[in-house]
Amino acid sequence: MEIRDVETVNRINLHSHIAGLGCDGDEVEYDKDGLVGQIKARKAMAVIRKMVESNKGGKVVLIKGDRGSGKTALAIGLSKSLGGVHFNSISGTEIYSLEMSKSEAITQALRKSVGLRIKESVKVIEGEVVSLSGRRIVLKTVDMESSFEIGEKMRGELDKEKVSAGDVIRIVRERGRVYKIGTSMVKRSDVVGTDTRFVPCPEGELIRITEETQEISLHDIDVVNSKAEGYLALFSGETGEIRAETRDEVNKKVWGWINEGKAEIVRGVLFIDEVHMLDIESFAFLNKAVEEDFCPVILVSTNKGECIVRGTDEPSPYGIPRDFIDRALIISMEKHCRRDLEAILRHRILEEDILIDDDAVDRLVSISEASGLRYSMNLLTISSMRASRRNGRVALGDVERAFELFLDEARGTESFNG
């Protein structure tokens, strides 16, 4: 019996090549960080980035443009340029669920986009392990040495970290945690292996106070406080409806920590793609949410012109109620020119590590002009699979064959109508 290898497709995210907004100060380069063209839109988004970095929330930003103009790419560029700031992305269709109400789904999305940076002074014991036996550990620094009694839980943590004499460790007693920093420099000659990290023996006191900072979203705090085993829902994702009373209690605690100087709010970004899919009730809820203290920047996108707002009989620009549009800063995406399309396709070719002839690229660019970037990128993947069967480069014939086999929207509609 003949055994054949089955070819697999390694899927690469459509926007995996994007690394930022391609801005250097106030200057925007034509092709940088995976974004091509759209200079005005990227300059506008750079201003929004400064707004987020300044911790200003409660603003609405609308990205409008045709299909394939790069609206989602621009939003992802903002996300990458912000680094660790909370950036939560949903589609306008995601809020419709049998498990929770629309207002609850939007509230959870908003609170996932706002972080709480908590500053905490903790007592730590840091030193080099001299000896470890039973329930007693001896630690030392350059200046002193002392013995500490440990419980079963702490002993378990030490065993889990594989702590032994000569290791430099940090113990956070209030949390019952042990962190292995490395191995003492004096043990370098005794240790075999290149993976060991060598560090000097600490100086000063064994016990000292240090300030630690951790960040958690408001939604995660809501979940933990919502039920007796709320922390388990963080891992399962099955949070369900969270009572308004729970959020009120969380907000009171958060304000208390802020007033005491123990924490600060970090407002991020909620990105709602296909915002025209929301109905009038959802927009009314968002209108109210924008005025709340803990509201992030709400970034929305649409490819619609004037159309009916869902849940009404009234037409409105972008399928969005006018009172919501009044709040929005609007960023307009331009139609890609041929130069833009070729540069974007070249990025995908490089990202997917595809060898391709220039005339095949030219054909894909022409297809992009007529049928859109997404369709031509799909053809690129199909053409690459076809070429890989002969271990060769993607040729013009591969693209033409893929074009014949898989119809674009216009040809598909024409064949359907007969």
UniProtKB/Swiss-Prot annotation:
Keyword Transferase (UniProt): no
Pfam families (alphabetical): TIP49 (PF06068), TIP49_C (PF17856)
GO biological process, one term: DNA repair
Keyword Coiled coil: no
Keyword entries, A-Z: Activator, ATP-binding, Chromatin regulator, DNA damage, DNA repair, Helicase, Hydrolase, Nucleotide-binding, Nucleus, rRNA processing, Transcription, Transcription regulation
EC number: 3.6.4.12
GO molecular function, one term: ATP binding
Catalytic reaction(s) noted: ATP + H2O = ADP + phosphate + H(+)
Ranges in a coiled coil: none
Enzyme class: hydrolase
Name assigned to this protein: RuvB-like helicase 2
Gene: RVB2
Protein family: Belongs to the RuvB family.
GO cellular component, one term: nucleus
Quaternary data: Component of the SWR1 chromatin remodeling complex, the INO80 chromatin remodeling complex, and of the R2TP complex.
Subcellular location: Nucleus
Task performed by this protein: DNA helicase which participates in several chromatin remodeling complexes, including the SWR1 and the INO80 complexes. The SWR1 complex mediates the ATP-dependent exchange of histone H2A for the H2A variant HZT1 leading to transcriptional regulation of selected genes by chromatin remodeling. The INO80 complex remodels chromatin by shifting nucleosomes and is involved in DNA repair. Also involved in pre-rRNA processing.
UniProt-annotated binding residues for ATP: 65-72
Main location: nucleus
Source domain of life: Eukaryota
Organism: Encephalitozoon cuniculi (strain GB-M1) (Microsporidian parasite)
